[in-house]
Amino acid sequence: AKIKIIVLDRPNPIKGNLIEGPLLNMDYQSFVGNYPIPIRYGLSIGELAKMMVGEKWIKGAPKLSVIKMKNWNRNQWYDETGLAWIKPSPNIPDLNTALIYPGMCLLEATNINEGRGTDKPFKRFGAPWIDNARLSNRLNKIKMPGVEFKPVTYIPTDIDGMAINPTFKNKICKGIEIKIIDRDIYQSVQIGLNIISILRDEYPNKFVINDKRMISLLGVDELNIFNEMPIDLKTIFSNINFIETSKKYI
């Protein structure tokens, strides 16, 4: 018998009107990407649940009931809702981290420390062999929208409940801290991809991408995009079909 599933809907913390990143190719379905949606999909959890059932992505789909929200505007950031922030993950302590995460989580498929083991996970990244002054200058010259990059030095350590054996544990890392200047134009996935592209260009003998892991995180086998600088997602990936289909569930 089908089990009834009740979803108490809640706001998408990084707005419900922005979509970013490639559409998952189901050939690369995995624990971190299970359905054909972009990295940043622009739906509430209830809307996504309705789409999963409506598009028959689940075999033996449950009887779904979504308890709708009241007074949510898709253009709202979470801190504009009046609701208290509750960490969705130990390493996403605040809203800015949630916004940065869709792009910077891609560093988890590399040999760079992604800020785990610090009080600013995903807001900073580094390695012992990075020239942080040179790298910050190069990143800032691209003039990516809504962001500035500043050089930092830090030491990743174990943090109870947050990080165990972070990359470059107890080693001095020279790196970059991400400062969001305008969150409304900040393009998380595009910024993450450009950072990886530049690291690959700057440190071809030291920076390493785990191809299999990166394909899982991206959801597509398009690693040649890291040959481009700067990367413009709009010219590479199209989410038109997803956008049109998702409208049925909004």
Please state what every model-predicted region is.
Residues G126-I240:
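Conserved functional hotspot residues or short segments at active or partner-binding sites
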Residues W72-E148, P156-T157:
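Glycine-rich, aromatic-lined ligand/substrate-binding cores of catalytic
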Residues L8-P11, M69-K70, A127, I181:
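Active-site-proximal beta-strand/loop segments in catalytic clefts of secreted hydrolases
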Residues I6-Y28:
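Glycine-rich, charge-decorated loop segments at or immediately adjacent to ligand/cofactor-binding or catalytic sites
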Residues Q29-P102:
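Conserved anion/nucleotide-ligand pocket segment
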Residues K2-K4:
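A short helix->loop->beta-strand "cap" motif at the edges of active sites that frequently abuts
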